[in-house]
Amino acid sequence: MTNLESNLKKILRGKKACTPGNFLKVPFWPYGKMKPAKGKMLGQGQYSKVYRGSINDNGRRYVAYKEIDTSKNTVGSGAFEYKVAKQLKGYGVPDQYMYKKCESMDILYLEHIKAKEFDIWWKTNPGMEEIKSVMLQVLYNLYRIKQEFPGFRHHDLHGGNILVRPVPTKEIVIRLGENQSYKVSNGGVEAVMIDFGLSVFPRITNPVISNGGYEYVGISKKSHPQYDLHTFLNTVWIKVIRPKNENERKIHEFIKSLIPTKYLGVMVMKKQTIIRRIGIDEGKGDIPGFKTVLNHSFFTGEKKVSKLNKLLKNITSKTKLKKPMVIAVPNKKSPVNQKAALTRAVTIMKAKQKPIIRRK
């Protein structure tokens, strides 16, 4: 438990957690003095509103809190969302501090993310490195979550549920297996996923979707494994459907190379027929897996290398080259003088024919 979480629980002990505006502080102008109040709303959903408040007087230790109206959302989704987000700590999800069930609302206390929604951030004209980094982080975190919790789906990854905040620039490592990884720059940004109210998670029942009320848009315990991948890439596709510059053209071509355009577009989102239209609820859609997408040269920056070339490269790097053996070539004999050789042979033959004189 962090110091911030510990101090928050001390301040909002018991029923105090049902009235955070009476204890958490916000700045009042013109002098910026910190006083207890609800303050400015940070975001709003169908049944919820999000605010922030500081646990101290200098305004440096803010927390966010999400108030869910239980007179409209009567199924108790707040407790479910808190449990799921708590399980996903370390996967690009805000830290969860506390859940409180009150008379007319559920309240979730969580890490305050000083960031912009993806849709708003996109309008600031970020560079290609930043865009690639955000896309890669979202997809890689989804891949990592599915490795740890195979049954997980977020089901609501539109631009309002992805936050982008500035962070120090550093390298991040994308690991796709024991011997498969690559490094890229984070582009000085971090992507954060929020709002798990429509998600499914192993061994935790979501009361919002358990009655089958969202099956008409493919949201259920049996939804397609690539639901989130498709929804997120379609969210980006809508922004580059008519490329306005070279960066958008590259993103357009990247998504087009992965998903047929008949499965993409504004009408897919507006009509809420993401699954029915493309048929991936029955496994008929041509939707690639996370590994295929993360291995794309759009992210890696390299061309695909054939398995044979990789194998040869590994063999070469592991094999020590021996010193080459030098074979001595015998010296050639001097050319034979045939005339001299014949004279010498005749002399020898005559000597053999001389009579032998014996002494008496």
Segments predicted by a language model, with ranges:
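Conserved kinase catalytic-core helix
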Residues: 125-155, 159-160
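Intrinsically disordered, Lys/Arg-rich low-complexity segments
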Residues: 313-360
